[in-house]
Swiss-Prot record:
Designated name of the protein: Ribonuclease 3
Domain RNase III: 17-146
Main location: cytoplasm
Organism: Staphylococcus epidermidis (strain ATCC 35984 / DSM 28319 / BCRC 17069 / CCUG 31568 / BM 3577 / RP62A)
SUPFAM superfamilies: dsRNA-binding domain-like (SSF54768), RNase III domain-like (SSF69065)
Domain DRBM: 172-241
The encoding gene: rnc
Residues annotated as binding Mg(2+): E59, D132, E135
Active site as annotated: D63, E135
Any one Gene Ontology molecular-function term assigned to this protein's record: double-stranded RNA binding
PROSITE patterns noted in UniProt: DS_RBD, RNASE_3_1, RNASE_3_2
Coiled coil (UniProt feature): none
Superkingdom of origin: Bacteria
Example GO biological process: mRNA processing
Length: 245
């Protein structure tokens, strides 16, 4: 019964994925690689698959590929901007809210393979899950087709938003807080994961932001990255409210 359900889900994914790539004008060779890119850990757990078959390794790779691609784009587009400005712009483009915008533009969340529990609790519309799948897809595209194809994809899905300044409202609180700290000569900012709880398909992470060896705020999120953003947001708001850090 379980194997039949898995086969049906995989078959449905392969059909949808093939149609999606065709609509994007992209070619692919290894569909198994892309299946992994869209396999959430809850899907892997539901069908007792190898834990390394979920998309987190590809997410790790895709994150780096995105940073490189966006860095090259900004480097070429803004030849007179200093490194600090380019870094800030890149952070806005590759932060979670922006990745969700890109993913939703092409409805990538429709492709994500989820476990039953994650599906029921709204995982398909969860921002952290969508952004992770987007990064994993980029990682898979890089391995399967190379950096030139990733660039082509970015030209269609990412760069138009940047050129139209449609990401102005997206806030990367880690960058905001870092810039404030730097302007005040307050020392180094680090983040530390202090708690991880809940079942594998519905994890909750708690991180704290540390300034000059002192924890100044905490944040919770469905991923470590999200919890760090929430912690930075709290710290930044404390600063805006003129409370001592």
């Amino acid at each position: 019964m379980a194997n039949q359900k898995k086969k049906e889900m995989v078959h449905d994914f392969q059909q949808k994925f093939t149609d999606k790539m065709k609509s994007l004008g992209l070619h692919f060779k290894n569909i198994d690689l892309y299946q992994q890119a869209f396999s959430h850990s809850s899907f892997i757990n539901d069908f007792n698959m190898n834990r390394l078959e979920h998309n987190e390794r590809l997410e790790f790779l895709g994150d780096a590929v995105l940073e490189l691609t966006v860095s090259r784009y900004l480097f070429d587009r803004h030849p007179h901007l200093p490194e600090g400005n380019l870094t800030k712009m890149r952070a806005t483009i590759v932060c979670e809210p922006s990745l969700v915008i890109f993913a939703n533009k092409i409805k990538l969340n429709e492709l994500i393979l989820l476990g039953k529990g994650e599906e029921k609790t709204g995982g398909r519309t969860r921002p952290s899950l969508i952004s992770d799948a987007f990064e994993a897809f980029v990682g898979a595209l890089y391995l399967d087709q190379g950096l030139d194809t990733v660039w082509t994809f970015a030209e269609k899905v990412i760069f138009p938003y940047v050129e139209d300044d449609e990401l102005v409202g997206v806030v990367d609180f880690k960058t905001q807080f870092q810039e404030y700290v730097h302007s005040q000569n307050k020392g180094d900012v680090t983040y530390q994961l202090i708690k991880e709880e809940g079942p594998a398909h519905h994890r909750l992470f708690t991180s704290e932001v540390i300034l000059e060896n002192k924890a100044v705020a905490e944040g919770k999120g469905k991923t470590k990255k999200e919890s760090e953003q929430k912690a930075a947001e709290q710290a930044y708001k404390l600063m805006k409210n003129k409370k001592s850090l």
